[in-house]
Amino acid sequence: MFGFGKAKLFQTHQTLLYQCMHFGEFALGLAQESADEDQIEFWETKLARITKLRDASLRKNGILDKEDGYFLDALREKCEEVFYKTELSKQQSFDDTFIPDGGWEDHFEDIRSNF
């Protein structure tokens, strides 16, 4: 389906989308529990953009443009930073927490089937 470079880019972008989306939902829940309006607005805005990027990626064989890839990479760094300030981080790592139930290969295959 892809050359090696495109396959790696596909996996990287889809991993970033998944982790940022699921962490954003987690962080939004924390913000809502503490009634932190600034954080609620921040995560709602980020989740809306991630959703748009996810939908756009499905129209482009799972690959995003360079700027969107940079955005997700920077957002993932922010997500990790916030995650490691939570109690959950004492139990497991960011990567071990935000992983699809069926594993990455099944997740990637599900995405490919949506093209």
Where are these regions (language model features)?
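Compositionally biased, low-complexity segments enriched in small residues
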Residues: 8-11, 42, 56-57, 74
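Amphipathic alpha-helical interaction surfaces
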Residues: 49-60, 78-81, 85
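Amphipathic alpha-helical binding modules
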Residues: 69-115
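Composition-driven detection of intrinsically disordered, low-complexity segments
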Residues: 46-51, 110
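Charged, low-complexity interaction regions
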Residues: 26-41, 58-66, 88-95
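Short terminal alpha-helical segments
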Residues: 2-38
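Short, aromatic- and cysteine-enriched interfacial helices/patches
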Residues: 1-8, 63, 113-115
